């Protein structure tokens, strides 16, 4: 909880920064605060079963890894003896636990129940963080006190915590909130701003805790934060604690005309401060001793010292264990290895690029400009090449391929980061793009080169088809001409036979045959049109026309003759050979003569 209403008092000092503000920083994280915050998001059974809080913790870590943040997780240790009454009072309110009547000693801390649900959540967070190369520092008592000590000793740049009493333990920069995703940000409070804008130093904040109430004291009932701040400022930051330790909280008294003293409503033996006496002597030695204990708990908390082996080990850097992380994510979230790699590997690659950029900037500061890929270079550039330009949430980025990073082919990184780390890669990419613009596209090349060949091949093919068509038509015309000549010869021979038999004695027999055929009613289909023994009398008048049925064979023969004539005419018009045209002309004249002779 921290100090009551202290965040409201510090509201004018609130600042919001984008997530990039955290890049290349070393931060301490109050692990209990983060897990309480993430667990409050959804307390349903499904959320607990699917470990939604642990997923949120994992995504926060990977976001900080991408920004090249060195993370130090700090967990709570034992409960301070001065905080035990407050802790039990909270448990009673939550679980309705009856008071056992045992008064704990003020100097004895209370070990936490390591088998509780929240302790199991902390263990899971430690496991998943260890696979990412992040170790957890187990505090002796309060985690925020340990974070504040590391920050005050400049072993970290800032602390993540929403317990406002972290400033009372000596923290300089505190991030209260963090938001990921689009437009991600952090909410920051700095002790320098608190001193400048509010006139409140660390001693003044401890005095406010005594007046307003905290985990270690109940404060003064009915005293508002505005009035408390005015009282503390009026005394001054340098002497406020001495005054409170020697005189108590008498400066916060509200005198009345009545001389009747009001007894404290809370027993002082339970480790918490009694309410301030409205009128009367407030220098009770027992109460003054309790005030001194609260001041000492804030000024000298039980923590690992900055030069201890425990702190040195927590500050050491460890590499993340890819295989172990895949196993843990499959156990906790049922993720396949590919999904775990998709989440973490791009962030690790971006962290490596930021470290390389820092190395480049340091070498530039000391005027040691080492060329890339040379033996003198301590590290190799992690970027293999730039693939294409991208824009993510309105920010210019590059999609790049990586060197020596198994499981990751390419990912997207900010363009300004690539420019700081390896500007020569950008130059190479621009030259490559300029060369592509000068040269025609591969598809256009294929079209331009293939169109002449296609057109030439089409011309050749059309010529071949025309040649074949001419050959076929010439062959057809020649065959049809030969057939027509044979038929004409047969008709001429028949014609001469018919003319020779005009005056023969069989004429009467022929007429009788016609009359008999008409009398019997036999159609033309039952007899051939021009039998060999039949004689046509061209001098005598033709017999009367009668309706006769025409056989199908005669119709087919007639249509066939018509087709032959058509073919002959078409072939005549399409032939270019002079000899062929001459023969065709002679054939037409011959056929015309035959038609005239038949008509006559």
Swiss-Prot record:
Any one biological process term the GO annotation gives: telomere maintenance
Stretches for region 5'-3' exonuclease domain: 215-353
A GO MF label: crossover junction DNA endonuclease activity
EC class (word): hydrolase
Region (Disordered): 433-458
Residue span of region I-domain: 130-218, 130-219
One GO CC term, this protein: nucleus
PANTHER family hit by this protein: FLAP ENDONUCLEASE FAMILY MEMBER, SINGLE-STRAND DNA ENDONUCLEASE 1
Protein name (Swiss-Prot/TrEMBL): Single-strand DNA endonuclease 1
């Amino acid at each position: 909880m921290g100090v009551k209403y202290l965040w409201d008092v510090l509201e004018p000092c609130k600042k919001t920064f984008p997530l990039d503000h955290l890049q290349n920083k070393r931060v301490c994280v109050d692990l209990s605060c983060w897990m309480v915050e993430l667990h409050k998001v959804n307390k349903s059974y499904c959320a607990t079963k699917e470990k939604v809080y642990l997923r949120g913790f994992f995504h926060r870590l990977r976001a900080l890894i991408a920004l090249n943040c060195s993370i130090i997780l700090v967990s709570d240790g034992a409960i301070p003896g001065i905080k035990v009454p407050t802790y039990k009072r909270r448990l009673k309110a939550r679980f309705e636990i009856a008071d056992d009547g045992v008064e704990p000693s003020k100097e004895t801390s209370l070990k936490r129940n390591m088998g509780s649900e929240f302790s199991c959540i902390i263990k899971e967070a430690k496991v998943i963080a260890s696979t990412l190369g992040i170790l957890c520092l187990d505090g002796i008592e309060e985690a925020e006190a340990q974070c504040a000590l590391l920050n005050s000793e400049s072993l970290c740049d800032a602390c993540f915590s929403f317990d406002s009493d972290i400033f009372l333990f000596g923290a300089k920069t505190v991030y209260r909130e963090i938001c990921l995703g689009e437009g991600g940000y952090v909410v920051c409070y700095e002790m320098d701003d608190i001193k400048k804008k509010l006139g409140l130093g660390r001693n003044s904040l401890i005095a406010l805790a005594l007046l307003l109430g905290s985990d270690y004291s109940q404060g003064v009932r009915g005293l508002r934060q505005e009035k408390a701040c005015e009282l503390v400022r009026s005394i001054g930051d340098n002497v406020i604690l001495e005054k409170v330790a020697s005189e108590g909280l008498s400066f916060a008294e509200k005198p009345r005309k009545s001389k009747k003293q009001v007894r404290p409503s809370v027993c002082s033996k339970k480790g918490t401060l009694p309410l301030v006496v409205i009128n009367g002597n407030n220098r009770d030695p027992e109460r003054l001793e309790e005030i001194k204990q609260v001041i000492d708990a804030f000024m000298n908390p039980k923590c690992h010292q900055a030069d201890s082996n425990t702190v040195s080990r927590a500050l050491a850097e460890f590499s993340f264990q890819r295989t172990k992380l895949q196993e843990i994510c499959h156990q906790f979230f049922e993720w396949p290895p590919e999904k775990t790699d998709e989440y973490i590997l791009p962030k690790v690659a971006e962290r490596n690029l930021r470290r390389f950029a820092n190395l480049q900037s340091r070498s530039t500061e000391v005027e040691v400009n080492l060329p890339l890929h040379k033996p003198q270079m301590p590290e190799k550039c992690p970027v293999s090449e730039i693939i294409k330009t991208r824009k993510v949430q309105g920010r210019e980025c590059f999609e790049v391929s990586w060197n020596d990073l198994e499981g990751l082919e390419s990912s997207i990184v900010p363009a300004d980061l690539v420019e700081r780390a390896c500007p020569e890669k950008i130059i190479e990419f621009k030259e490559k793009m300029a060369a592509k613009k000068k040269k025609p596209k591969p598809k256009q090349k294929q079209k331009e080169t293939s169109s002449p060949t296609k057109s030439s091949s089409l011309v050749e093919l059309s010529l071949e088809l025309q040649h074949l068509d001419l050959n076929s038509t010439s062959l057809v015309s020649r065959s049809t001409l030969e057939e027509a000549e044979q038929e004409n010869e047969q008709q001429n021979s028949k014609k001469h036979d018919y003319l020779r038999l005009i005056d023969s004695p069989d004429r009467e027999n022929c007429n009788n045959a016609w009359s008999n055929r008409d009398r019997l009613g036999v159609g033309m289909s039952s007899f051939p049109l021009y039998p060999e023994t039949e004689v046509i009398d061209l001098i005598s008048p033709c017999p009367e026309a009668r309706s006769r049925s025409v056989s199908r064979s005669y119709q087919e023969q007639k249509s066939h003759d018509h087709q032959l004539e058509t073919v002959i005419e078409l072939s005549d018009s399409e032939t270019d050979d002079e000899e062929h045209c001459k023969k065709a002309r002679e054939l037409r004249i011959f056929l015309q003569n035959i038609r005239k002779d038949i008509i006559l």
